[in-house]
Amino acid sequence: MNSKIRDYIFLILCASIVFNEIPNNIRLNFLGGEYSNLFAVYPLLLGIAFTGIWQYKNGNILIAKEKMSCYGIIYVGILSVSLIHGLFIYPYYTEILNGPVSQIQKLPLVLSLLSKLGLNLDTSHILVGWMGIRFFKTIILDFIYSFGGAYLIFCWYYKNKERAFKIFSEGISISLGIYFFYGLVECLYLAHFRIATETLKIINPFIHTIEVSHGWWPKYLSPDQFRSVFPEPSHIGNYMAIIIPFITTDIIYGDTGKKRTNAKKYLLLFLSALSIFLTKARTPNAMLLGMMILLLLFILIHFKKESLKHFIYILCVIGISFLCSLGFMNFTKNRETSIDKSVYHANKFIEDNIGTLASDNKRSNGARYSMLRYHVRLGLSHPILGVGKGLHAAYANDYLTDKEKKYREVRLWLDDQKKEGILKSNLGALNEYVGRFSDTGILGLIVFLSPFIWIIFRLWEKLQFDFHNDDQGNLKISFFLLYSLISCLASGFNILISVVYGVWVVLGLSFLWIYGSKNKSKNVVGKPKGIENA
């Protein structure tokens, strides 16, 4: 594969992870499936095309094809059996046929074509087949863009993994530049600068969709919460699951010789933490707290006085960013800035964003936990295979309790389902793992998590190996990958991990780091040696 084309595609893929809800008119819905909202689909499709052409001509780019094919067959096979089981037990075909026509726009065309061919089949039987094909395509595309995307990265850089990390660093740096530049405009908007407001009104429709879901999401403007290029402040938590490990790892294990370089690292950390606090959203704030706890655990396990010192500096910078965020919020609300008021607002911020996480009646928790419990009940009713990929929404009325249906957001979701139709409704669990459990059962959840669990253990072994050999270059990469991958998976407890495509990039880099070719060329961050017998 042409290395320049490969590098440009990978650079665009890494840089574009901030664009996770692109406008409808540029989406590739048929080819993108559930990932069509991500800009990452474009570089991925280019990568698939170039890889396919190169493989056809030279046959030397795909690595470990048998193992990947075996896993793909198992993954698709289990989810397909789950889907067949779900279609067999599905009790809502009549509701679909009697519901809005917009949810089955292509079905009349199928019926008309079959009629012309002289095949007069029962409409409900055709609906079953049509739904089966539709959701089987979803399963295939889901695998291609998730694990398939990670596999492409592994294959592209199998013989030159240090190049992959260099391009990744450049791409993430570009994404940060976009994130901060757009965030600056949004901060000016939050501070009531009219020119910033008018600028966002012009640009936002080109960045993400506007009020397409439930008639109100994503908002045209976010008047009280920072969100930068993302459609939802909570999505920043998924992005920061990569950015915070990226920055803090460089602070702890990177080159500390130049003061200007160190100042740049701490400035990036300050701005990243500040943006998290300005979201006033629980997901990114809880993620930041969790990542700091995880970082401390790693440092205590591999204790070094120097690392602990860096950790204290990191906490100090985050603390300063927290105080600055309170000052900014006070300024934008024209509040008094006395010490008593500042302490009050600090306590209120912590209570609203951290203290309410376990409360069932604070902020949107009632609706969130209602959907979570509904999916748990649904999964427990079919624990082995679930109800089938994409079929869970129809069960909402039967599995939500009367009390849960009274929450405002739940009522809006159910009303939207009646209006748009069952097949156009999502009603997700807002939790990656509970959602997969209800959709695909325990088997589907296991086959999904297996690669993550496997590579996390291998990364831990590699980290131990690098630590005992005092290999600072390798240690930096091993630490970042393990730290970031665990953080990305942790984000799945409050939202889907694929909200930001970065998790699949990190997964691909993790397999590349452990199983990539052990070349000895000089690396900008070290000389990767891999694990013996990896």
What are these model-derived regions, one by one?
Residues 358-373, 377, 381, 385-440:
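Long extracytoplasmic/lumenal interhelical loops at the membrane interface
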Residues 9-17, 263-272, 313, 427, ...:
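Loop-to-helix entry and N-terminal half of a specific, functionally important transmembrane alpha helix
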Residues 14, 18, 46-51, 243-245, ...:
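Transmembrane alpha-helices of multi-pass inner-membrane enzymes
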Residues 46-60, 102-189:
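Transmembrane alpha-helical segments and their membrane-water interfaces
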Residues 88, 181, 187-194, 299-359, ...:
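A membrane-periplasm/extracellular boundary helix in multi-pass inner-membrane enzymes
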Residues 1-121, 163, 202-204, 251-263, ...:
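Transmembrane signal-anchor hairpin modules in multi-pass inner-membrane enzymes, especially those
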Residues 22-31, 118-130, 212-229, 418-434:
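Juxtamembrane membrane-water interface segments that cap and precede transmembrane helices
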